[in-house]
Curated annotation (Swiss-Prot):
Enzyme class: transferase
Ligand binding (Mg(2+)): D8, E57
Name of the gene: acpS
Keyword Cell membrane: no
Tagged with keyword Cytoplasm: yes
GO terms under biological process: fatty acid biosynthetic process
Annotated GO CC locations: cytoplasm
The protein's name in its UniProt record: Holo-[acyl-carrier-protein] synthase
Keywords for this protein: Cytoplasm, Fatty acid biosynthesis, Fatty acid metabolism, Lipid biosynthesis, Lipid metabolism, Magnesium, Metal-binding, Transferase
EC number per UniProt: 2.7.8.7
Amino acid sequence: MIIGIGSDLIDIRRIENSLERHGQRFVQRIYTEVEQARSENRRARAASYAKRFAAKEACAKALGTGLAQGVFWRDMGVVNLPSGAPTMALTGGALARLEKILPPGHKAAIHLTITDDFPLAQAFVIIEALPVEQAPH
């Protein structure tokens, strides 16, 4: 069953401006080490960071909190499954919120799609509650 859905659309130029104005302070405040490693050496660095920013916003919406109630930027990070598909890794307040909204006997599957077409980046997140016997391992 779907227990959360969120989407976000961001102007990549907004992230470009933040990167230029605030540099590493911005990057370290918002992005996990894994996200930084994936984005830093990309030719389209700002687009890579913008997609991850949109994913965090979409995930926070899917959790039902937005970036509030103890859910912080670095509590949510875009990671890739062995197949290469993106998903979200949650820690801290985001993980606590996920555990709170999961029905007993269920595990979460977080589905994420991210895309960009300059000047926009977009993300959709669906949080699915699967019975433990069906949950991916």
